[in-house]
Amino acid sequence: MSHSIRENITQIRQEIGNVELVVVSKYRTIGELNQVYETNQRDFAENRVQELTKKKELMPNDIRWHMIGHLQTNKVKFIAPFIHLIQSVDRIKLLKEINKEARKNHRVIPILLQVHIAEEEHKFGFSMNDLAQIFESNEISEFKNVELLGLMGMATNTTDTAIIKSEFKKLESFFNKWKDKMNWTKLSMGMSGDYIQAIECGSSLIRVGSRIFQ
């Protein structure tokens, strides 16, 4: 039995309490996204810049757009004027480019650093060791036009909840170690298949798509 978009969002909101919900809009029609918007949802996320810019033109102006996919440096300029949060900053080269484009647009762009916590090699992100060195060197403070709000991570794509929770717990522990020094407020963990486990492990923001539209 399929549920309506409104019913699915209502159920998710009841499950997650005060955790921030960002709706992943990839592969979805404008009609479907408007149904989500009508539930007072304003935070939407895309994996690809081309889709993000296209949907921004077609959707209401008060939507807060998040970038959650692997971002090429040559595409940053297309989203720099308006992006609400780039959650997938996975390398210093990209951080430099975001800072440069933010400066051109006379703004400060909020970001999360993506941390590689999964067993799969194809997932992107900094290692925790690399990040610890970056934070200890205070390198981040050089980037005046980005605001680092916290971390993002993706668990291994598995049905083994023990593995998922172990990876999320590892990231939560790293987040807690640095959050006071770095003034972090956001820990983005959890998608359609694992957001319950992510919240149990301290996530403050979840990225949900297919669970809403099923």
Give a label for each model feature.
Residues 1-193, 199-201:
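Conserved alpha/beta-domain cores
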Residues 203-214:
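Gly/Pro- and small hydrophobic-enriched strand-loop and loop-to-helix capping segments
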